[in-house]
Amino acid sequence: MKNIILQYKKKYDAGEPISVVTCYDYTFATLFNRTDVDCLLVGDSLGMVIQGNQSTLPVTLDEIIYHTKAVCKGAPDKTIIADLPFLSYQTSIEEGIRSAGRVLKETNASCVKLEGDSEFIIELTKRMTESGIPVFAHLGLTPQSVHTLGGHRVQGKTEAARNKMIRKSRELAEAGAFALLLEMVPESLGKEITESIRIPTIGIGAGKYTSGQVLVMQDLLGLNEDFHPKFLKKFGNLSGAVKEAVNAYHKEVTKREYPSEAHVFLDT
């Protein structure tokens, strides 16, 4: 497993954009391991795209560990980011460090990702870093706080909100975060934050000036036909390919064309 801090620093220093995609299972991890993508994120977004929930809040630490183990097995050549899910780290510094420690010890992940900018999160970032746990920070739209943010909407649109996010970005970097995810913020704010801190920024709906980009695999592959946010470009249409393949299978089964002689075991 590569060292994610060294990987990100090398690309950041060279001005090379960093590509990240989410992944939740062994099969896709083996495919992504054979691609050029830099890094995989086992996000608590699995609560929505895998479990069918309306938010990320129901995801548990054990579920993150389960999925991260599978991804690490399938993609040994990639660096792996693991989300810490809702209420696995917000209750106390000790609980946060314990949860992060479990993820790193049990999964072989490269780092953990924390959402938020409170004084508690900044202190937790500092304490985790001091404990040898690499921390990936996350600002802007933070899905674990979706109820207090008023839903899934662009953040940092007012001058006060912009200034606060810039300030908190600096504080998180100073606390030891080695990278920062910026989600659903105006492009100009993504650019300003990226230029104001000396760690890589990874954007999702944060414009083209961040140090890299991340997308949910189901979205970029075109597996979710009903999801069309402004920031998303679908780089494939796998939903159509999947339906075509399953319908072809169904047709051959009902016509007794499958299995053919090529797919059965003969007596001789």
From Swiss-Prot:
This is 3-methyl-2-oxobutanoate hydroxymethyltransferase. Its cofactor is Mg(2+). 3-methyl-2-oxobutanoate binds at residues 44-45, 83, 113. The lineage of its organism: Bacteria, Pseudomonadati, Spirochaetota, Spirochaetia, Leptospirales. Mg(2+) binds at residues 44, 83, 115. Belongs to the PanB family. It comes from Leptospira biflexa serovar Patoc (strain Patoc 1 / ATCC 23582 / Paris). Homodecamer; pentamer of dimers. It is an enzyme of class 2 (transferase). The keyword Transit peptide does not apply. It holds the Pfam family Pantoate_transf. It is found in: Cytoplasm. Pathway: Cofactor biosynthesis; (R)-pantothenate biosynthesis; (R)-pantoate from 3-methyl-2-oxobutanoate: step 1/2.
